[in-house]
Structure formats: structure tokens, C-alpha cells
Amino acid sequence: MATANLRRGYVLGLTAYVIWGLFPLYFKLLERIPAVEIIVQRAVWSALFGAVLLLFWKHPGWWRELRQNPQRFVVLAASGLLIASNWMTYVWAVNNGHMLEASLGYYINPLINVMLGMLLLKERLRPLQWLAVALASLGVAQQVWQLGSLPWVSLVLALTFGFYGLIRKKAPVAALPGLVVETWLLLPLALVWLLFFADGPTSETAFWSTPEALWVVAAGPVTLVPLVCFNAAARHLPYATLGFLQYLAPTLVLLQAILLFGEHLDSSRLTAFAFIWLALAVYSFDAWRSLRRLPQPG
């Protein structure tokens, strides 16, 4: 049974990260639609699809618990704005030739989490964690020196997702209900935008009779299915294994950027990636070594 659960965990985890890693292929199908319009539609269809999913959610007490702690709605509203900002930056990057920067941002994210833990949660870093953060900082500094500006796409993606995770710690709601409630709280903003500011393709009635409309509607399941797979995988896999699997998504994005969409990995970018990869190797080794030192059950 344990082996079967582990195998199931690997399949589910790989499914989640492969879907996340292939997001650029999906968003390229919507390339003519502005990023903000895609995100508004994504919020709407995720809210609707999420409502259907929650009808089958096995933990029905989540809504009662949320209503008994109304301050969590405020936290989820803030985290919803952060994840929407993350989504919009990512979609813009994919459809404007900045997939390499997007990939770099998600490579940096675990190290940003370490820094946020140190600065805001007063967590103490181990020596190898300090080394990993220093190497990542050198990678970012190298980009600033070469380009003359901050790699803002990478930093916005890493910081919004890092703060998103940090804020969600303040609202202990299961991942799926939490994300669905976030999209529900985004709905008023989305509807205002659709009613008063929408002037792109999806605002035209004729659009909804085209095949492209199906891809827009698919934003709901495309957003939520990998999250469901990830949550299920987390119940069957060691945390360290999930930590290693998370690098699959940015690696797939990196490969698509170079092999499919013609983005150039020049020596400057390669140097930055090398610093980040080395930092992640140090970080992963430190995490693995720390887990080995924990007392084993039984």
C-alpha cells in the first residue's frame, strides 16, 4: 500500500508540475488577448469551475470555519490580489517574449521564501542557506550590471508568489477552497472591469462563437486541476521530494523559451542562471541534509 501511495504521489506531483510548466503553450493560444483581459476571464472561470469542484470537496466544514473567522476573508482578499498580480505578470511575460525571465523568477522563488522567512518571520538561516541566498543575489546583481536595470519580471514573479505564500499562512484554509474563495473575492473587480473597461476580443459577442472562446473558458480547469493534483501529491510524497519536483516547471518553461519560441540564452543570462542553479543546488543539499538529521519514526 505504501509503495502504491508513493507511486500515486509521484504521478500526481509530476502531473501538477508538468501542467504548470506547459502553461506557456496554453497562454500562447490566447496571445492576441491582452494580459489583463486573460486574467479577468481566468478569475471568472476559476470562480465558476471552483464552485462546481467544491460541491464534491470532502471537507464540507471549511465554509463554516471560514465564516467563524471573518478576518480570514481579509487575508484571502489580499492574497487574491497578489496571485492575480502574479498571474498577470506571468501571462504578459509569456506573450511578450520574456519567458526566460519568467523561468528565472520561479527558480528564484524558493530562495525568496528563505529571505522572507528571515526578514519577516525572524527565522534563523543555516550557513548553507546564507550561501544560497548570497549566490542568488550575485545572479540578480549580475543581471543588473549587464542590463543596467533590475530583472523586474523575475523579481515580481518571485516576490508576489513569495508574499502570497507568506500571507496564506495567516489564513489556514485548505489550498483548493482558499484559491476558490480568492477568485470569488476577485469577482467584483473582474465584473466592474468587464462592464466598464473591457474593449478587447472577449468583449465582442462574436468572440464567444469561436474556437478561441473554448480556450478562455478552459482557464478555470487549467488553473485548478494542477492545484488539486498537487494537494493530493502532497499527502503521499515526502516534502523534500516535492521540493525537488518544483524545479520541473521553470525548467520546462526555460526549454520552451529556447527551443520553441526562439528566446536567446546569451552569456549574460546564462551566467545569471548559473548562479541561481548553484544556489538551488546548495539550498537543496542543505534541505536534504537537514531532513536526514531528523529522527525517523519507528
From Swiss-Prot:
Keyword tags: Cell membrane, Membrane, Transmembrane, Transmembrane helix, Transport
Principal location: membrane
Chain ranges passing through the membrane: 9-28, 38-60, 72-94, 104-121, 128-145, 150-167, 174-196, 211-233, 240-262, 272-291
NCBIfam families named among the record's database cross-references: rarD (TIGR00688)
Annotated compartments: Cell membrane
Top-level taxon: Bacteria
InterPro entries attached to this UniProt entry: EamA_dom, RarD
Transmembrane helix in keyword set: yes
Family as reported in the entry's similarity comment: Belongs to the EamA transporter family.
Protein name: Uncharacterized transporter PA0485
Name of a matching Pfam family: EamA
Residue ranges occupied by any EamA domain in the UniProt entry: 18-141
Record membrane topology: Multi-pass membrane protein
